[in-house]
Amino acid sequence: MAKVAKDLNPRVQKMSLGQQQSARGVPCLRCKGTCSGFEPHSWRKICKSCKCSQEDHCLSSDLEDDRKIGRLLMDSKYSTLTARVKGGDGIRIYKRNRMIMTNPIATGKDPTFDTITYEWAPPGVTQKLGLQYMELIPKEKQPVTGTEGALYRRRQLMHQLPIYDQDPSRCRGLLENELKVMEEFVKQYKSEALGVGEVALPGQGGLPKEEGKQQEKPEGAETAPPTTNGSIGDPSKEYVCELCKGVAPADSPVVYSDRAGYSKQWHPACFVCAKCSEPLVDLIYFWKDGAPWCGRHYCESLRPRCSGCDEIIFSEDYQRVEDLAWHRKHFVCEGCEQQLGGRAYIVTMGQLLCPTCSKSKRS
C-alpha cells in the first residue's frame, strides 16, 4: 500500500491543519455579511457556508504570506530576498519591503502628520522612485494599509501563488511517487522559470543594488554616458514597453525581468500575467513562451489542475471532461457530493453536478 505524502512531514502537516482551524469564522469579502463566517470544506478550497473561495475570506496573515514567499524563493537565485528564521530548521522568510510616507499637515500650533504605509514596495530603489512606481499602478490596486488595494494584494498572493503549488505538505493525499514528481516539478520551475521583476529607470535594469539606489539624478548633474554593457540609459534612445508598445519616459520607472533580458521593459501597470492579465503580485513571475505568467497559470500550462480541490494533478490517472480535469476521487457532484465516476453528470459553467442537483439548480 502506497504511503501518502502528508505522513512524511507530520510537523508541517499539523501546522497546516492548525492554520485552517484558526481561520474558522473569518467573514467573506464577497458575500458582504450574508456568510456566517468561514467554515472549511474537508478537501475543497472553499467555505462550506457560502461556497466562496478561501481567497474571498482572505485567510492568510502577513507572517503566513511572508513564510510562503520565503519558501518559494529559497533554493533559487532570488534567495537573497529571504532571511533565515532563527531556530526555524532552515525555514526562510520573505524580506518584504514596506514603504512609509509621512507628510506634515499644517493645523494650528501643533504639527500633525499624515502617514501612508504601503504593505509592499519594490526592493532596491529609493523612496522617490518607489513612490513614482506606486503612482503608475491603478489606485485601487496600490497596497496601502487599510484599503481595498491591500486586500487585493493579499487575495492575489493566494490566487496567483497557491501554497499547494510549491509545498507538498499542503497537498491532500499525495502518493509517494506523486510526491517525487511534484518535488522535481517545483525544483525545475525554480531553476528555469521563477523570477522577480526589478524596478529601475529605463536603461538602468541590471545594475548592482548599490548602484541601483543611485538612480535619481541630482539637480544640475549631467546625464551619465552609456557604458559598453548598456547598463546606463542612453538619453537619445527611445524605450518601448514590451506589452503595450508605448514609450517609457526616461524619468519614469519601468519593470525589468532578468529572464527576458535587459533589452525589454514594461510599464509598471503592464507587467501582468500573459494568461489572466492581472498585475503580477510583488512582481513575482514565471517566464514562459517569451512572456511573464503568474504562478497559478504557469503551473496549469504544464500540468492539469483539479477542478475539485484546486491542486495540481501529479498522477497520470485522472478524469478529464473537455478542458477540465479532476482527481478521480474528486470527481463528485458539487451539490450532493456523490461520486460521479461511471454515472451521469452535467458540467455547467465549470460546475460538476449530478442530474438531480443540476435540475434543482435550474429551477
Curated annotation (Swiss-Prot):
Chain residue ranges for the region called Disordered: 200-234
One Gene Ontology MF term: transcription corepressor activity
Location(s), subcellular: Cytoplasm; Nucleus
Gene3D superfamilies, sorted: Cysteine Rich Protein
CDD domains assigned: LIM1_Testin_like, PET_testin
This protein's GO CC annotations: cytoplasm; nucleus
Residue stretches making up the PET domain: 99-206
Keyword Transcription carried by entry: yes
Disulfide bonds: none
Main location, first listed in the record: cytoplasm
Domain of life: Eukaryota
Calcium among keywords: no
Pfam families: LIM (PF00412), PET (PF06297)
LIM zinc-binding domain ranges (all copies): 239-304, 305-363
Residues that bear Phosphoserine: S16
Comp. bias intervals (Basic and acidic residues): 208-220
InterPro entries attached to this UniProt entry: PET_domain (IPR010442), PET_testin (IPR033724), Pk/Esn/Tes (IPR047120), Znf_LIM (IPR001781)
Alphabetical UniProt keywords: Cytoplasm, LIM domain, Metal-binding, Nucleus, Phosphoprotein, Repeat, Repressor, Transcription, Transcription regulation, Zinc
UniProt GO BP: positive regulation of calcineurin-NFAT signaling cascade; regulation of cardiac muscle hypertrophy
Subunit and partners: Interacts with beta-dystroglycan. Interacts with GATA1, GATA4 and GATA6.
UniProt function note: Transcriptional cofactor that restricts GATA6 function by inhibiting DNA-binding, resulting in repression of GATA6 transcriptional activation of downstream target genes. Represses GATA6-mediated trans activation of lung- and cardiac tissue-specific promoters. Inhibits DNA-binding by GATA4 and GATA1 to the cTNC promoter. Plays a critical role in the development of cardiac hypertrophy via activation of calcineurin/nuclear factor of activated T-cells signaling pathway.
Entry's free-text remark on domains: The LIM zinc-binding domains and the Cys-rich region mediate interaction with GATA6.
PANTHER family for this protein: LIM AND CYSTEINE-RICH DOMAINS PROTEIN 1, LIM DOMAIN-CONTAINING PROTEIN
Protein name per UniProt: LIM and cysteine-rich domains protein 1
